[in-house]
Swiss-Prot record:
It comes from Desulforapulum autotrophicum (strain ATCC 43914 / DSM 3382 / VKM B-1955 / HRM2) (Desulfobacterium autotrophicum). The gene is rpsM. One of its GO terms (cellular component) is small ribosomal subunit. Signal peptide: none annotated. This is Small ribosomal subunit protein uS13. PANTHER family: 30S RIBOSOMAL PROTEIN S13/40S RIBOSOMAL PROTEIN S18, SMALL RIBOSOMAL SUBUNIT PROTEIN US13M.
Amino acid sequence: MARIAGVDLPRNKHVEIALTYIYGIGRTRSQQILEKVGINPTLKSDALTEEQVNDIRKVIDSDFKVEGELRTQISMNIKRLMDLGCYRGLRHRKSLPCRGQRTSTNARTRKGPKRAAVKKKK
């Protein structure tokens, strides 16, 4: 089982699909990496030689941010928006959608489950 960027790639899948198990690599990036290294995308990941795995590792390490490094960058970008106090930052702070969606009836995923209304005592 090949281990790239701290992720164990599944054995029985094509290399193109197996690389998408790494956070930050989708189908397009996977195809770009394999084209750069010169590996057939339909090759099964357990058929990769150690040299091919090392080539893939080098390309990923040099060209792309993946896994923890990418997660850190994304969270820092969101934190920066919140510190700036811009509209998007305020929406993140309030846990509301920040891309213009309606919130009157929808946005339950972002807002969380409904809270029961508190009745006033008479």
